[in-house]
Structures are given as C-alpha cells and as structure tokens.
C-alpha cells in the first residue's frame, strides 16, 4: 500500500479555448498561406487524445503554471529535461563513430529546457495512461498503482546507475528487436525510397499503398541552404570532420535536390518547416550521396508559456546542444543553422533509427514494459546531469502520490480540452483545408 503524501491543491487551469492557445503558440512560426502548415497541425491534433497530448504541450505547461507551483519553485530540482518524452520520442538513433552505428535513448529535442525533473516524471505517467486508453487496455486500481510504481522504481534504479540507456536496456527484447531491425538496412535503401530516376526527390512517398510524405521541390533555395550547411559545419567541428570539404562553393556544387517535407503522421512539429537536401558524396570515406535533414525549431513549449525564461541560444542551437548533452553516445550528425531568420536543427536522413510504437503496447504486461523503458531512459539521462545526489532524496512515496494525483487531474483536463477542440468550428474548417491540400498531392 502506498503511503499518501502531501498533494497540492489542483486548480482549474482551462484556457478560454484550446484552439486559441494553440494558434497563439504555433501560427506565428508557420507560413500563413500554406495549407500544409497550420491546417495540418490542427488536423493532426484533432485525430485522437494521444496525438492531442503529443502535439499540444502548450496546454500542459499552461496547466503546470497553476498546478505544479511547488515543483516550479524547487529551483535545485531544475535540470535539462527532454520536455516532451512520449513513447515516440524514445528510440534508436544514428550514433557517433562508424557510419551506421546505433544507440538507444531520447530523440527529438524540440521542447527541451531546464525544468524540474518532476515534470518529466509526470509526463511519463500521463503518456503511459493515455497509451492504455488509446489501446483500450482497462486498468484496475491495483494496476494503476503497479504502473506508476514500475515507472518510479526503474527511474530510481537508472538514476542510481553508472550506465547509459543503451547498456541498461541491452537485454530488453523490445529494444534488441528494434536495434536488430535497424541494422538490417543499407543507406542505399533510403536513397531508393526518396530519389527518383532523374536524381531528384520524389514528390511523395507511400507506405503499404497509403500516402506517407509529401515532398515539394525547393531547388530554387540552393544558395540559401548551401550557406546554411556551411554554417552548420562551422558550429560543429565533429560534423565538419566528416565532410570532404566545408567550402561554400563545394557545398553549393554538391547540392543535387531540395524538397520541403510534410510527414502525414507527425504531431508535435507538424506544420513547421522541414527540408531534405540531397548532397553528392559529401562525406570522407563514404561513396554515397547523403540526405541532410533540416528541421525548423521554435522556442520550447515551456518558454512559450513563460514557465521558464527564453533561452539565450537560438532554438536550433538549444536543440542541438541539448541533444549532445542528453545522449550517450552522441549522435552521428548534429548541428544547427539559421536560414532567412528561421532557426533549424541539422541532422541527416537515414534508415537505421526508429522510435517506440505505442501500438505495440497491447496489454498490461507490455504497458509495464513500456514503463520500464521510459523510466530507464529518463533516469539514465537525468543522471548524466550529475544531479543524482539531488534527485534520489526527492524520490519519496509522497512524490509518487503527487504524480499519481496530478496525472488524474491533467488527464481530466486534457479530455475536456480535446472535446472542446474537436467541437470548435475553426478546427473543422482547417481540417477541410488540410484534407484538400493533401488530396491535391496524392498520386504525384
């Protein structure tokens, strides 16, 4: 039986209309006349409560301002957080060293920031509970307690360990299967999926006959992106050492094709700009074209909601720095640049990495396994901050009770917000615009 600790009073923190808060947060950073931008963001959020959770973190941090004031005033507990650690942001990634190396941990640092570690744990339990709801896994009161305790205990174990997430999860069958699957692929597989016979990006990609991505040609921006790549290499000596040349004219000549990417399954960053850039054999010792991936970054959700001050770094720099800081081993490609006043994270498109799929959680046993993975990844990463001596004394039954109560409260708020969002006429109209835009690209 869990001891009941002190639980702060929970405050009604609903925004006037969820749509308005999301529009204020995202539309300033999106191209107003692009129906594959903000309308696609809205379409994604309206899909189901789980995608709404993944892509509406402004509503979560707005709620936290009123309902987690004790944590937000606990300044020693502030550490580098991922900020949006749902299951789709945990997975394998291309790691430093040999081309094709894989490691396991946090990915996609769009919402990273210095926050109380307790908020990361709260997001973990919310994610797991929503995963159960989405997959129609009914939990008894006893199972609710077992789930939160599994998350808490594995987090504590990982914080107290001296090993990274890849090592700690080396025997986990889910993870070994994920890594094994990724290692089967060749880089040529990726090029074949995206590049046509003319050496240019295809206009769309498909998975099992369904439209997966829309790729809009952007070759006219080659000069801008050559300068951006040169800037990214200047920002990352590790990345620059991989390139045959870092000269601007050589980089410009190596650009073969550029496409603006829209991935239909995206949630959190849906509507922001992403670009693929095909470079002709730019790397030392790698006799292959490479696809660079530039992803627009904006202030994190906690910054947008004034939970924490604006970072002095650009959003792309914050994202790249925090990825280096919070992953062990470090990623193979990781830098940042500015393009036309917008901030971008610079990575590369490869076939090896993959994320956890919530659809693989089919019963309580696999839900517990997901909790163990989440707790291990978060705990090992937070330990890398060197703050385990601060974190461990905080991990009391009282904190666990708080996290359980606040999870219940936020889930009630989220479902209320989601219902209001779906019922908003503006959402309906924007979904129609997004559907028309997608349809116009189908079959291209």
For the regions a language model picked out, list residue spans one by one.
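Bacterial N-terminal signal peptides
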Residues: 1-9
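Generic low-complexity, intrinsically disordered sequence content enriched
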Residues: 6, 14-16, 182, 195, ...
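Conserved ATP-binding subdomain of kinase catalytic cores across diverse folds
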Residues: 14-34, 47, 51-82, 87-184, ...
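ATP-dependent kinase catalytic cores of phosphoinositide-metabolizing enzymes
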Residues: 17-45, 61, 216, 220-241, ...
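Acidic catalytic cores of enzymes that act on phosphate-bearing nucleotides/polynucleotides
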Residues: 188-267, 278
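Short, amphipathic C-terminal "tail helix"
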Residues: 430-443
């Amino acid at each position: 039986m869990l001891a009941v600790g002190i639980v702060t009073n929970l405050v009604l923190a609903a925004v006037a209309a969820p749509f308005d808060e999301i529009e204020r947060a995202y539309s300033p950073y999106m191209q107003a006349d692009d129906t594959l931008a903000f309308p696609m963001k809205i379409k994604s959020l309206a899909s189901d409560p789980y995608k709404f959770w993944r892509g509406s973190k402004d509503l979560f941090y707005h709620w936290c301002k009123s309902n987690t004031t004790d944590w937000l005033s606990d300044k020693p507990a502030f550490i580098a957080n991922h900020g949006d650690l749902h299951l789709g942001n945990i997975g394998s990634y291309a790691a430093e060293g040999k081309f094709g190396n894989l490691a396991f941990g946090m990915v996609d640092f769009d919402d990273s920031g210095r926050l109380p570690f307790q908020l990361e744990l709260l997001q973990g339990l919310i994610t797991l509970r929503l995963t159960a709801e989405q997959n129609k896994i009914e939990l008894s009161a006893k199972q609710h307690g077992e789930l939160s305790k599994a998350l808490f205990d594995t987090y504590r174990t990982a914080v107290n360990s001296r090993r990274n997430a890849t090592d700690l999860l080396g025997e986990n069958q889910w993870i070994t299967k994920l890594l094994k699957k990724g290692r089967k692929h060749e880089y040529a597989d990726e090029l074949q999926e995206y590049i046509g016979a003319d050496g240019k990006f295809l206009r769309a990609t498909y998975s099992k006959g369904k439209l997966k991505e829309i790729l809009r040609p952007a070759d006219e921006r080659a000069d801008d992106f050559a300068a951006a790549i040169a800037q990214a290499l200047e920002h990352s000596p590790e990345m620059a050492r991989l390139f045959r040349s870092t000269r601007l004219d050589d980089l410009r000549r190596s650009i073969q094709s550029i496409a603006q990417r829209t991935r239909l399954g995206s949630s959190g960053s849906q509507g922001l700009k992403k670009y693929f850039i095909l470079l002709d054999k730019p790397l030392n010792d790698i006799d292959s074209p490479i696809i660079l991936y530039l992803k627009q970054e904006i202030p994190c959700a906690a910054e947008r909601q004034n939970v924490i001050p604006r970072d002095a770094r650009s959003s792309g720099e914050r994202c790249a720095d925090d990825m280096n800081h919070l992953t062990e081993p470090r990623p193979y490609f990781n830098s940042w640049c500015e393009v036309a006043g917008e901030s971008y994270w610079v990575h590369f498109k490869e076939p090896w990495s993959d994320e956890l799929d919530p659809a693989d959680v089919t019963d309580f046993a696999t839900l517990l396994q997901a909790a163990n993975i989440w707790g291990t990844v978060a705990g090992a990463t937070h330990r890398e901050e060197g703050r385990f001596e601060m974190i461990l004394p905080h991990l009391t039954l009282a904190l666990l009770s708080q996290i359980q109560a606040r999870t219940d409260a936020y889930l009630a708020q989220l479902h209320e917000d989601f219902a209001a969002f779906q019922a908003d006429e503006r959402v309906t109209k924007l979904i129609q615009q997004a559907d028309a835009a997608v349809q116009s690209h189908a079959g291209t």
